[in-house]
Each structure stands twice: as C-alpha cells, then as structure tokens.
Amino acid sequence: MSVKVIVTDMDGTFLNDAKTYNQPRFMAQYQELKKRGIKFVVASGNQYYQLISFFPELKDEISFVAENGALVYEHGKQLFHGELTRHESRIVIGELLKDKQLNFVACGLQSAYVSENAPEAFVALMAKHYHRLKPVKDYQEIDDVLFKFSLNLPDEQIPLVIDKLHVALDGIMKPVTSGFGFIDLIIPGLHKANGISRLLKRWDLSPQNVVAIGDSGNDAEMLKMARYSFAMGNAAENIKQIARYATDDNNHEGALNVIQAVLDNTSPFNS
C-alpha cells in the first residue's frame, strides 16, 4: 500500500447532515495518520475561513483546497489563488444580474460578497458556508480578487440554469454542482484536482498515493485522479459511476470508515 495522502470533501461527505463529525474518532485517527506520515487534505467548495472552523486545533497542520480549487493552503500558509480579470468579473456579474430571481455570492480572496438586497434566508444560508460575508450595494464595485461565484436554487431549476450559464460564460467560468441546491461557477481548470495536484507536486507525490472521498459533481475530477477513489453511500449517481470504490453514507461516518480501512490495511488497501 502506498497511501500518503487522504483527501476528503466536507458537505455530504466528511460532515453528517447536522454539519458535524465524530471528533474523538477522527482526532485519534489523525494522530495515527501523523505517525505514519500520511497527509490529510480538506477539499471543498466552501470558503477557507469556514473550513478551518471545523479543525481549530489542526488548521496549521493540515492542508486545504478551498473554493473548489481556487484557493490552496498548506499549514496555514496560502500557496495559490485563482484570479479572474476585472473584465471577466464584470461579464460574469452582468450575466448573473440579468435574472432578477437569481441570488448569488461573489467569492474573493479577502471575503465573499452578497447583495444588500438579497433575501434574508439566502444570506443566512450562505453565511453558513462563507464565514466572511460582506453585504455590497453594487457587485461591480467590489475591490478584491474574485475567483468563484456561488448560487443556490431549487433542485428542479438547476439543470436549466447550468445549461444557460454554460453557454453564456463559456471559456470564462464553468458551472458545477456541489450538492444541496448549490451551483458554483469556477474558473475552467481550477477544480479540486488542480489544487490537489499543486500539493502533490510540492510533496513529490503522485495520484497513485492518493485516497479521495466525495459525493457531488465538484468531486468528479479529484475522484478520477486518485488511485483510491471512494463515493459516499449518499453520492450522486454519476459520482458512484466515477469512483472505484464505495463507502457508507455521510450519516454513518463513511469518510472516517475509509480512513480506518487505510489505518487497518484492509480492502482495498491490502492488495
């Protein structure tokens, strides 16, 4: 077995539906991973400041691929961030503002931004995923490096909106689903696998050394990349098709069960 890196998504994967995880179990596992020199990476569409809130004791020890790959941190230090040009940002914002029913968050290096006129329920939902969230009068006046946009919609509207944005923003941003009604607009090529690849290069490791665990469309590239790819029991069907292996759902500690299999050297890690 040559596992040197374990990468996990958060929502619908590492976290249960109550947005918590079995901390005593994981902390014991983490100490064992550390002893064996196995690195732990969180890869999520969420904001870095939100992600570190789940790992206050470990935030300067582990690595984070945040914002779906647009922001990479190792041991508390920023290694990489994506960047839209000011012109590209204006095009994207202009397109999103065409639909008056569409609420969205603009994600930047310093903060995430939401319209001061956005519905309270939308702001409250987004605040759970973006711990730094500032209200703005005009998205076009944001003075920050922008690298992602996030929308939340009823599930039945998602395919139509994705198709529309795919055409309108072709070459500038790519829409991906991240579960729970979320659509993220990412810079083409700046997905989770790209962020993980940056860390692997730094560590002189390869995808052959990686275990990746996920449940949604934004996990597809990292699952295709990793030698040991696991779909959660609650994963979207297309993700189950992509992953080589399956684990339990997020309410039955599916991600922690994979980590335990690595530590116990049981199937598929014993072949």
UniProtKB/Swiss-Prot annotation:
Expression is induced as follows: Regulated by the cAMP receptor protein crp.
Query: What is this protein called in UniProt?
Result: Sugar phosphatase YbiV
The residues that the entry says bind phosphate are M10, S44, G45, K192, N218
Name the protein family. Belongs to the HAD-like hydrolase superfamily. Cof family. SupH subfamily.
* EC annotation from Swiss-Prot or TrEMBL: 3.1.3.23
Q: Which reaction does it catalyse?
A: sugar phosphate + H2O = sugar + phosphate
Give the protein's cofactors.
Mg(2+); Mn(2+); Co(2+); Zn(2+)
Q: Does the keyword DNA repair apply?
A: no
> How does the annotation summarize its subunit structure?
Homodimer.
The residues responsible for catalysis, as annotated, are: D9
The record lists Mg(2+) as bound by D9, D11, D215, S216
Under SUPFAM superfamilies, the record lists: HAD-like
**Which terms in the GO cellular component ontology are assigned?**
cytosol
